[in-house]
């Protein structure tokens, strides 16, 4: 009997390319390939299994077969507005684990444990020890001051005129060039951070510093990397005054994510942050009922 080939497993998130933006076309599976078909019928093959996430802008349509294949290979589909500013919907790629969700929820619900996690986030962001008696309000105030100064410093270094972080998500074109570049750049970062959060088995919505949003935990994690990655990339792009700033800043972010090996760092950082709470993931009781159908056997 000829031995069968083993099932193909998804590529680990750390080995994937970061994010691709697509619009004005239809995603489908044709002859086994994941393709984008534009309005002229021209096909462009997308290596969906090697991507962390696909950001789908206005004008994009997705077939059932394309969604199914993206889910099987673990590529996150994110439906966004022009420039990636507004999030409309997310296709879950699988990977969530109840033990890790319960662990995350326990850390978030306990005020003492939650503060430990928040202080660890601030320590990683600003390179200082915040384990002493700081309240969340004090940390937020400190964050605001340092973030504003961070923007001003990078603007000075790149020669960009900076009037503050201002944009209207309902009027994309009304923002100035630096803010448009920043919005497009942070959208790219949010996409890969959400893919990493889901790949690690956690919930994007259970945040610690951010709360009340579908992507609260994504924002928490993205903030840990923002000022070393997408903010400098956005200002450098704005300094060039390109004709298509959103397109150029996405290319810059893609290259930067690859150079810094960001996808290899996000999940270990998530674990480091949550470990600061000082508890272990809860073990299930002996009497719980296991799944009737294992995940890898579901159709």
Curated annotation (Swiss-Prot):
Its EC number is 3.1.-.-. It comes from Methanospirillum hungatei JF-1 (strain ATCC 27890 / DSM 864 / NBRC 100397 / JF-1). Keywords: Antiviral defense, DNA-binding, Endonuclease, Hydrolase, Magnesium, Manganese, Metal-binding, Nuclease. This is CRISPR-associated endonuclease Cas1 3. PANTHER family: CRISPR-ASSOCIATED ENDONUCLEASE CAS1 (PTHR34353:SF3), CRISPR-ASSOCIATED ENDONUCLEASE CAS1 1 (PTHR34353). Its cofactor is Mg(2+); Mn(2+). Homodimer, forms a heterotetramer with a Cas2 homodimer. CRISPR (clustered regularly interspaced short palindromic repeat), is an adaptive immune system that provides protection against mobile genetic elements (viruses, transposable elements and conjugative plasmids). CRISPR clusters contain spacers, sequences complementary to antecedent mobile elements, and target invading nucleic acids. CRISPR clusters are transcribed and processed into CRISPR RNA (crRNA). Acts as a dsDNA endonuclease. Involved in the integration of spacer DNA into the CRISPR cassette. Belongs to the CRISPR-associated endonuclease Cas1 family.
């Amino acid at each position: 009997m000829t031995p069968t080939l083993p099932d193909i497993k998804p590529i680990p998130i750390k080995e994937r390319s970061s994010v691709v933006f697509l619009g004005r076309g239809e995603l489908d599976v044709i002859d086994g390939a994941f393709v984008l078909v534009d309005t002229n019928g021209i096909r462009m093959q997308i290596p969906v299994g090697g991507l962390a996430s696909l950001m789908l802008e206005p004008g994009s349509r997705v077939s059932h077969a394309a969604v199914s294949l993206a889910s099987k290979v673990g590529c996150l589909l994110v439906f966004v507005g022009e420039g990636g500013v507004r999030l409309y919907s997310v296709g879950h790629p699988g990977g969530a684990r109840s033990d890790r969700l319960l662990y995350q929820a326990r850390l978030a619900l306990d005020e003492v444990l939650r503060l430990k996690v928040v202080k660890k986030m601030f320590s990683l962001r600003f390179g200082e020890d915040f384990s002493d008696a700081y309240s969340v309000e004090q940390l937020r105030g400190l964050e605001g001051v340092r973030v504003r100064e961070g923007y001003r410093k990078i603007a000075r270094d790149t020669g960009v005129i900076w009037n503050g972080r201002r944009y209207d998500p309902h009027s994309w074109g009304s923002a100035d060039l630096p803010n448009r570049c920043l919005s497009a750049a942070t959208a790219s970062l949010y996409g890969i951070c959400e893919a990493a959060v889901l790949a690690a088995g956690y919930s994007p919505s259970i945040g610690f510093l951010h709360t009340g949003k579908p992507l609260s935990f994504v924002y928490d994690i993205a903030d840990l990397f923002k000022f070393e990655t997408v903010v400098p990339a956005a200002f450098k792009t704005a300094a060039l005054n390109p004709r298509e700033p959103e397109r150029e800043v996405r290319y810059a972010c893609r290259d930067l994510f690859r150079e810094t090996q960001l996808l290899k760092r996000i999940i270990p950082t998530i674990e480091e942050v949550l470990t600061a709470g000082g508890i272990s993931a809860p073990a299930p009781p002996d009497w719980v009922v296991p799944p009737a159908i294992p995940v890898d056997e579901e159709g």
